[in-house]
Amino acid sequence: MTTLTIDAKLFTDALRRVLPHAEKPNSGTPILENVRFTVRGSWLVIQATDRYTVGESRVPLSEVDAAAELDVLADAARVRALVTALRRDALVMLTDDEDEVTLSGAYVTPLDVHRVRDWPAVDRLWPAELGEGVEGPLALNVATLKKLSALPQSTAERRDEVPTFHSVKPGGPVVVLFGEDTRVLAMPGRVNADRARARFGDWHPAA
């Protein structure tokens, strides 16, 4: 049996940054209505995607827990309820008992989770390295901006931090970094640079 013990405050902060990227219930793609938990090195990585964005946040693990092998999914709607119910000063336990995997904490009902299957290969979408910033106009739809707005609100200690935007090539995916432990991959919309400049120029008519 494997049990990971995680600080509830770090855990819930990470989830609040990731949950906006999970697909909504009854979306027609039930696999994306989950949140993924996987151990990578000395981190528990929490991931969600709705095909248009990928959100990841990580929580540090002890040396003992970092040796665990774990890759599971949990229903995003039930994880949201768990986040609301968890006490911030509690510990969260992610337990793999061969027959079942559970996510539990003080004063909350244990949540059954499932081993990963059919999860989209979103890890390969991340670029190997980042550019210096975003070149040219950047178009992000309102839904994506709403998801990104959850980043600085997730924890009071980080409200003075700002997300940074990076791209590998014009028109390609945009990577948004927030602090050291959260990243988002977003697909930009199409933008006509000449039209954008013309629209901006309308605000500054010639004398």
Regions inferred by a protein language model and the residue ranges of each:
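DNA polymerase processivity clamps
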Residues: 1-207
